[in-house]
C-alpha cells in the first residue's frame, strides 16, 4: 500500500481543482475506475460520477476549497481524517470527516463523508 496521506491529498487536490478537464485527470489518478464518494447531499461512482460530484461542488461552493485538518489515520487498507471546506474569505463553511478504503494500487476505492458542522 502506498502512503495514505499522499493519496488523500491527491483526492482533495482533485476536488479542489477548478478546471473541469484538469479535475477529471486528477480524479483518474486518485481514484480507482469504480471508486465512489458518498456524502449526505451527493454521491458519485466511477470516474464520470466523481467528475459530476466535482462539478456540483464547484457550482454550489464556488471559490471554496477542502483542507485536511488532521493527520490521516490509516491501517488495513482503510483511512480517516478530518477536513474543512474553507471559503474564499478564509471562513469555514463546513467541517467533516472522511473515512474510506484504499485499493491495492494506492488509489481511493471508497470515500464516505460525515459532515459535522454547517
Regions picked out by a protein language model, each given a short descriptive name:
Residues 16, 57-118:
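A beta-strand edge to alpha-helix "cap/lid" segment located at domain peripheries
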Residues 12, 36, 80-82:
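Short aromatic/hydrophobic contact patches that present stacked aromatics
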Residues 22-77:
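A solvent-exposed, acidic/Ser-Thr-rich amphipathic alpha-helical stretch
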Residues 1-30:
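Short acidic-aromatic low-complexity motifs
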Residues 17-21, 40, 90:
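Alpha-helix boundary/capping and short turn/kink residues
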